[in-house]
């Protein structure tokens, strides 16, 4: 599901330039019902930095697609970069078919591979800063040249403050993901009371409530 965007953003941070302006194309549009969107339209102009924030904080699928097209020159080109990176870090049971994580039978991973991907991303300070954002302001220009501003809240309930971790555990941040096929998913980085880092992944929970309850049970093992 949307934990896919960890890889999307990691590649964008490695190959993209934050100040580059991206013009949204028809190829970036998402038609799937219920998909989380920034609601971009063809002709809108937005920086790579704002696409990255929208992808990670809001989990906007159209932003992730636009980001991928701008860096990979096409969705297919970017997906090839994602799969190459997965192989480089040893995530050999992973195959990406899109940059956002919406359901596709040829798009799959494992909890261990997601640990490898998140662990790789954690080496990037900008990524660490992103996953700690409680909220963000996304700024762009519509096709008529009018400035637009959208405030978004982090979908990670540990970060937005709606769920508390166990005593002594600090959740640095991570990425949520939810589809009918994948269930409720979460991959997070955390630290225990003595500062030791952990990466925790839960997939296929039957609800958001269950997901965060189970994650807290897992986090208690860190102390």
Residue ranges and their predicted role:
Residues 73-223:
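Penicillin-recognizing serine hydrolase domain
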Residues 1-112, 121-125:
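Active-site-adjacent loops and short helices of periplasmic peptidoglycan-processing enzymes
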